C-alpha cells in the first residue's frame, strides 16, 4: 500500500471557512465538500508543499497572512482516478490553521466549486469524512 503525507489548510477569512467541492469523477472523496490540500513531494519541505498546493488548487491571488501547524492524524482511503481505477492509500494528514487577507480564489480542475462558509453553516454541507473529523476536532461542528 502506498503512503502519502497530505498537507491541509483550514483557511479562515473574517469568520468564514473555505470549502472546496471535489470533482465528481476523481479523488478520494468525489463530489463532496472538503478542505483543499494535497501530497508532499519527495524532498519538499512541509510549508513549501502547503504553499504550492494552495497556489495550484486555489490560485495565485489568495493571500495568507497566518499559517500555523494545528493537528495531524492518519487514515486509509480509496482514491478514484479519472479513468475509474482505484487505489488504497495510507494517508498522513498535516492540518494547518490559516488566515487569508482576501477571498480571491481560482479553483483548478480538482474542484467543481468553492464556498466561504460561516461556522454555523458548515453542518449544512455534504462534507467528506476527513473534513468532518477535522472540523469536529476544531469545535466547528
From Swiss-Prot:
Residues 1-141 form the Nudix hydrolase domain. It is an enzyme of class 3 (hydrolase). A motif (Nudix box) lies at residues 38-59. It holds the Pfam family NUDIX. It catalyses: a ribonucleoside 5'-triphosphate + H2O = a ribonucleoside 5'-phosphate + diphosphate + H(+); a 2'-deoxyribonucleoside 5'-triphosphate + H2O = a 2'-deoxyribonucleoside 5'-phosphate + diphosphate + H(+); dUTP + H2O = dUMP + diphosphate + H(+); dTTP + H2O = dTMP + diphosphate + H(+). Its EC number is 3.6.1.9, 3.6.1.12, 3.6.1.-, 3.6.1.23. One of its GO terms (molecular function) is dTTP diphosphatase activity. It comes from the Bacteria. Keywords: Hydrolase, Magnesium. The keyword Endoplasmic reticulum does not apply. The keyword Magnesium applies. Signal peptide: none annotated. HAMAP family: Nudix_NudI. Catalyzes the hydrolysis of nucleoside triphosphates, with a preference for pyrimidine deoxynucleoside triphosphates (dUTP, dTTP and dCTP). Monomer. Belongs to the Nudix hydrolase family. NudI subfamily. This is Nucleoside triphosphatase NudI.
Amino acid at each position: 500500500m502506498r503512503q502519502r503525507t497530505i498537507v491541509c489548510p483550514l483557511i479562515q477569512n473574517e469568520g468564514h471557512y473555505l470549502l472546496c467541492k471535489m470533482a465528481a469523477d476523481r479523488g478520494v472523496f468525489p463530489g463532496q465538500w472538503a478542505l483543499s490540500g494535497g501530497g508532499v513531494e519527495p524532498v519538499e519541505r512541509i510549508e513549501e508543499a502547503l504553499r504550492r498546493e494552495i497556489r495550484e488548487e486555489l490560485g495565485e491571488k489568495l493571500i495568507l497572512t497566518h499559517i500555523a501547524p494545528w493537528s495531524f492524524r492518519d487514515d486509509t482511503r480509496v482514491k478514484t482516478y479519472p479513468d475509474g481505477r482505484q487505489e488504497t492509500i495510507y494517508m498522513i494528514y498535516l492540518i494547518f490553521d490559516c488566515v487569508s487577507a482576501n477571498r480571491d480564489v481560482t479553483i483548478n480542475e480538482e474542484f467543481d466549486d468553492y464556498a466561504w462558509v460561516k461556522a454555523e453553516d458548515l453542518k449544512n454541507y455534504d462534507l467528506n469524512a476527513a473534513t468532518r473529523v477535522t472540523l469536529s476536532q476544531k469545535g466547528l461542528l
